[in-house]
Amino acid sequence: MSRAVIIALVILVAAVSTTATALIVNSRASNPSAPEEQRTAKEKFFGAGKALPPIKDGQEMGPRW
């Protein structure tokens, strides 16, 4: 095969892989966020993601001796 054919094939493969990557990324980004049921289950298991309340005086973490 001539050099021009090899270069054309390499460019074609690069273009196809770039297009496939862009389509995969866009399809994942277009999915809506988790439904309400999944979100509540996640918050129940992992916590709500809110900031923890401040530590009261005398309740600091210390060694258990």
Swiss-Prot record:
Keywords assigned: Conjugation, Periplasm, Plasmid, Signal
Protein's name in the database: Probable conjugal transfer protein TrbK
Compartments in which it is found: Periplasm
The keyword Repeat appears for this protein: no
Annotated source species: Sinorhizobium fredii (strain NBRC 101917 / NGR234)
Listed GO CC annotations: periplasmic space
Family, per entry: To A.tumefaciens Ti plasmid TrbK.
Pfam families in the record: DUF2749
Superkingdom of origin: Bacteria
Predominant location category: periplasm
Signal peptide interval: 1-19
